[in-house]
């Protein structure tokens, strides 16, 4: 592999890495959207005219667990993508010239 091919592969990997990171940041739930999501769904889960009912507490806890699970999944996906692109960059840099 020639030096120009290696540079081209490296540039392609970097461009694809940064595009994947920007897409993930675009689709990751922000704190504002999470709080709006919680307000809408937790308020609908509450019993009418009772603020601190057992049902509302359970629903709020379930929503919090779902939010944490979703955030953890996005974080894991983000880390996996970083590992894949880092590995592909290291492979493209360490391929011997023919």
From Swiss-Prot:
One cellular component (GO) term of this entry: membrane
Protein name: Putative uncharacterized protein YHR049C-A
Membrane association type: Multi-pass membrane protein
Segments traversing the membrane: 8-28, 73-93
Primary residence: membrane
Keyword field: Membrane, Transmembrane, Transmembrane helix
Subcellular localization(s) per the UniProt record: Membrane
Superkingdom, natural source: Eukaryota
């Amino acid at each position: 592999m020639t030096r120009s091919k290696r540079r081209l592969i490296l540039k392609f990997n970097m461009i694809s890495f940064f595009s994947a990171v920007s897409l993930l940041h675009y689709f990751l739930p922000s704190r504002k959207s999470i709080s709006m999501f919680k307000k809408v769904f937790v308020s609908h889960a509450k019993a009418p005219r009772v603020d601190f009912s057992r049902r509302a507490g359970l629903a709020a806890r379930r929503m919090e667990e779902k939010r944490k699970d979703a955030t953890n999944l996005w974080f894991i996906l983000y880390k996996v993508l970083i590992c894949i692109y880092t590995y592909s960059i290291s492979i493209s840099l360490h391929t011997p010239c023919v």
